[in-house]
């Protein structure tokens, strides 16, 4: 299962960060940008599109973190877009269209990091505070 969520917090802001983690992450990035995956851990400017119509949603920064060298230990990406509600909702709506992709539960990225040995229990508990 691949999960995604707004990781920059709710509300309007200048920049919003959508995090994606799981086996479908690379597929999601390729379809949203109509390009190959960027170099690992390199901030790359990309146009982010509707997967059915290719209509532009926003232009933003993509950062790709291949497994196992990611926060969760899985393939993971961050998409940094403009922080308006319309952009965030449109992007989340597009990601939700992928099979085996679902909205993450609160704390689920940290849970994966703990389960995959990326952080210890003390660190996991401190993140929750």
Which residues fall in each region the model found?
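A glycine-rich (often HGG/GG-containing) alpha/beta subdomain
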Residues: 1-129
């Amino acid at each position: 299962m691949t999960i995604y969520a707004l990781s920059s917090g709710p509300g309007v802001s200048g920049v919003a960060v959508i995090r994606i983690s799981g086996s479908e992450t690379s597929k999601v990035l390729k379809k949203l940008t109509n390009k190959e995956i960027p170099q690992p851990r390199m901030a790359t400017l990309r146009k982010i599109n509707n997967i059915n119509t290719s209509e532009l949603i926003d232009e933003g920064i993509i950062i790709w973190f291949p497994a196992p060298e990611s926060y969760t230990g899985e393939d993971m990406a961050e998409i940094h877009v403009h922080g308006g509600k319309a952009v965030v909702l449109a992007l989340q709506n597009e990601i939700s269209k992928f099979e085996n992709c679902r909205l993450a539960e609160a704390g689920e990225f940290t849970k994966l990091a703990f389960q995959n040995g990326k952080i210890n229990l003390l660190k996991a508990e401190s993140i929750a505070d």
